[in-house]
């Protein structure tokens, strides 16, 4: 029996009751779900559910493990948005904050770092952007935002082979990962904020079931070229945070409060005019 199990067994009953009460409060904030497919991620559960039809009790449900944002500095936001397209063999456009904090020191120590990581310099992000030669002035141009770094499609790509896009103000998305060993961990808040999925091919089959066959999806994965597929009908995506939730078998499951949101909500509920930001995520995060 591990330490985590022992700690869970030692949680007082009144605290477990509070967890359930907070879950009920969060459910109250959600919009009414229309019939049809949905993709739901419960952040502290490190789990994704893809429903063929959320209104049907006997509908097929695709489930898989996920990796979410780091608790200390890269928390995955709660949101609701519409998945509109999928990129096969995507480029990874390195965000400026990741460049500044993580890549810049490595570049300064090793000018060959970009080539080693299958990365390149570009003036603008875009699949048709031309690579720019790295030279002595490149680092200063990168600091000023006049050049950018992206990682080419391939085995090293941080996004893996598939990226699932649903425009949102936080610029997060679902994607594959080359770091497959992370899914064997119990605690999986390890990303920069995006959600990494354990079985991206199966999720692509779910999202494209009315458009592409499994063979067509496999063919797109086998071609080392970026290909974008627009969904004929967008799919709602919900990133949710609750530490008490029912699994597909209707069994209650309790999760660790990895982001400390339960404690925040307990305090917020003492003043009905001061609820946590999750209470208003529906109005703030539904992408048009």
Show the residue positions of the predicted features.
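Well-ordered beta-sheet/strand-loop patches within structured domains
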Residues: 3-288
């Amino acid at each position: 029996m591990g330490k985590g199990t022992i700690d869970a067994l030692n949680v007082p009953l009144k605290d477990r009751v509070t967890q359930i009460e907070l879950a009920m409060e969060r459910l109250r904030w959600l919009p009414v779900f229309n019939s049809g497919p949905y993709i739901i991620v419960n952040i502290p559960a490190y789990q994704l559910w893809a429903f063929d039809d959320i209104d049907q009790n006997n509908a097929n449900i695709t489930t898989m493990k996920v990796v979410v944002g780091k608790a200390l500095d890269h928390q995955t936001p709660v949101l609701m948005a519409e998945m509109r397209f999928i990129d096969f063999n995507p480029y990874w456009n390195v965000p400026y904050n990741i460049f500044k904090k993580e890549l810049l020191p490595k570049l300064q120590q090793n000018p060959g770092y970009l080539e080693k990581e299958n990365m390149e310099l570009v003036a603008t992000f875009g699949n048709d952007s031309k690579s720019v030669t790295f030279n002595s002035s490149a680092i200063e141009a990168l600091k000023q935002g006049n050049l950018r770094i992206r990682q080419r499609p391939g085995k090293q790509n941080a996004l893996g082979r598939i990226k699932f896009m649903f425009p949102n103000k936080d610029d997060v998305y679902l994607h594959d990962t080359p770091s497959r060993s992370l899914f064997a961990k119990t605690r999986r808040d390890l990303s920069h904020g995006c959600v990494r999925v354990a079985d991206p091919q199966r999720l692509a089959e779910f999202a494209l079931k009315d458009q592409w066959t499994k063979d067509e999806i496999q063919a797109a994965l086998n071609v080392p070229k970026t290909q974008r597929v627009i969904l004929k009908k967008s799919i709602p995506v919900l990133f949710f945070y609750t530490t008490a939730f029912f699994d597909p078998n209707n069994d209650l499951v309790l999760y660790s409060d990895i982001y400390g949101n339960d404690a925040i909500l307990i305090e917020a509920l003492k003043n009905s005019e001061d609820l946590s930001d999750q209470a208003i995520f529906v109005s703030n995060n539904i992408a048009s």
